[in-house]
């Protein structure tokens, strides 16, 4: 197999590169010859000796599931910055702001493949874009809790690598289903926690409005308080709720992906020979860039959007994974001898950033209730919501997008999320 993919240096003329890709593609369309089979059978995973790289991955990952991690009780009303600091410590995520800052320096879509799990937000009236509806929810105990397990697990057990190549496609499908189950189980707890913080934030804002009216000359204090509270909610609540959501959901995606990926690394490490038979094809580049990947030791054929994955692309993706504490993806056919496993990807200030894809994923959750219970049937969002930008204005990819809701038909909008789509076959 190596004979068909030779990477001797960093430079290829267009003719050389096309010839190698064509030869490689032709090989994939035919039955493996004796030399290929011999290479597969003689594959030695010791060739993949660990190369010291800058990574935050936890060493010696275990196959066992992560232990229970209980939250604090739902927070009491407090200023936004105090609630944000509490959330940082409750998640044990002090590096959260620096991670969010890194997402501003990456042009890769890491998040749009994650499922939106909209069914978890259908009844979240506390997220309504109508300030009046938000205020109505403050008197209810729906959004309070005693403790939540932030390391909830799905119903599936971690699938183990197969012993025969015929079982590889079903194994990859099982891994993806396992991950989606783990993610949804945790997201239920994270969503409940988010509602608790939103309630505490909204109640603090309501109390601030009442306090500001105490010395005001208003004939009807009750009417004045209601009007002032709606105004304060419109001006402050949505911006701060979005800030909480960014921190909370980036932690959800990173912690779940780290835990599952480390377990996969441990379970697949001793059975790397079987993955030489794997042909993995990502139909879209964003599928390859997704934070979660079902195969850590992808030693077979790797195709992205119909072309062979290159070593520089693999190094750039592994650099991003190392930045976020994820195991590196190892590809024996792609890696170049005597070259580092990681290198920084290029960056353009004019291109979409990873932070924007994260915000789009979050927005899809925050908008669920209001889209299914619109205050005004003629509008996607309520006029009370002052942070909604004009839809005809193009999004500013270099800054936080403040609108919680955007027109999904907008041609400039980011592709909706979906599970990782991968075409799997065997050689």
From Swiss-Prot:
One of its GO terms (biological process) is regulation of DNA-templated transcription. It comes from the Viruses. GO terms for molecular function: DNA binding. The keyword Amino-acid biosynthesis does not apply. SUPFAM superfamilies: Conserved core of transcriptional regulatory protein vp16. It is found in: Virion tegument; Host nucleus. GO terms for cellular component: host cell nucleus; viral tegument. The keyword Transcription applies. Keywords: DNA-binding, Host nucleus, Phosphoprotein, Transcription, Transcription regulation, Virion, Virion tegument. InterPro entries: Alpha_TIF (IPR003174), Alpha_TIF_sf (IPR036538). Belongs to the herpesviridae tegument protein VP16 protein family. Transcriptional activator of immediate-early (IE) gene products (alpha genes). Acts as a key activator of lytic infection by initiating the lytic program through the assembly of the transcriptional regulatory VP16-induced complex composed of VP16 and two cellular factors, HCFC1 and POU2F1. VP16-induced complex represents a regulatory switch: when it is on, it promotes IE-gene expression and thus lytic infection, and when it is off, it limits IE-gene transcription favoring latent infection. This is Tegument protein VP16 homolog.
């Amino acid at each position: 197999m190596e004979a068909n993919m030779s990477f001797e240096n960093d430079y290829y003329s267009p003719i050389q590169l096309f010839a190698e890709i064509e030869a490689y593609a032709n090989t994939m369309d035919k039955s493996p010859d004796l030399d290929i089979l011999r290479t597969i059978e003689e594959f030695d995973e010791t060739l993949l000796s660990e190369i010291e790289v800058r990574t935050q991955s936890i060493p010696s990952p275990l196959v066992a599931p992560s232990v229970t991690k209980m939250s604090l009780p739902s927070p009491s009303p407090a200023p936004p910055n105090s609630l944000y600091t509490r959330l940082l410590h409750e998640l044990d995520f002090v590096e959260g702001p620096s991670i969010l800052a890194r997402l501003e320096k990456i042009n890769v879509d890491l998040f749009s493949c994650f499922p939106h799990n909209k069914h978890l937000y259908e009844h979240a009236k506390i997220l309504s874009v109508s300030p009046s509806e938000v205020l109505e929810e403050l008197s209810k105990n729906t959004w309070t809790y005693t403790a939540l397990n932030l390391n909830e697990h799905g119903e599936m057990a971690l699938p183990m690598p197969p012993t025969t190549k015929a079982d590889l496609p079903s194994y990859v499908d099982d891994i993806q289903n396992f991950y989606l189950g783990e993610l949804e189980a945790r997201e239920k707890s994270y969503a409940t926690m988010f509602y608790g913080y939103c309630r505490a934030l909204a109640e603090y804002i309501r109390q601030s409005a009442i306090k500001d009216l105490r010395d005001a000359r208003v004939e009807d204090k009750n009417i004045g308080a209601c009007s002032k509270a709606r105004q304060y909610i419109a001006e402050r609540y949505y911006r701060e709720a979005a800030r909480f959501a960014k921190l909370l959901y980036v932690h959800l995606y990173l912690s779940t992906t780290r835990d599952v990926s480390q377990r996969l690394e441990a379970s697949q490490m001793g059975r790397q020979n079987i993955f030489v038979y794997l042909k993995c094809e990502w139909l879209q580049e964003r599928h390859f860039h997704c934070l979660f990947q079902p195969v850590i030791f992808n030693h077979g054929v790797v195709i992205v959007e119909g072309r062979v994955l290159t070593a520089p692309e693999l190094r750039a993706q592994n650099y991003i994974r190392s930045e976020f504490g994820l195991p590196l993806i190892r590809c024996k056919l792609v890696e170049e001898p005597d070259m580092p496993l990681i290198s920084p990807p290029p960056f353009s200030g004019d291109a979409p950033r990873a932070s924007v894809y994260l915000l789009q994923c979050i927005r899809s959750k925050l908008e669920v209730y209001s889209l299914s219970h619109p205050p005004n049937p003629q509008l996607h969002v309520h006029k009370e919501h002052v942070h909604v930008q004009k839809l005809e204005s193009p999004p500013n990819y270099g800054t936080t997008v403040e609108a919680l809701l955007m027109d999904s038909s907008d041609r400039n909008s980011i592709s909706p999320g979906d599970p990782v789509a991968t075409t799997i076959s065997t050689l």
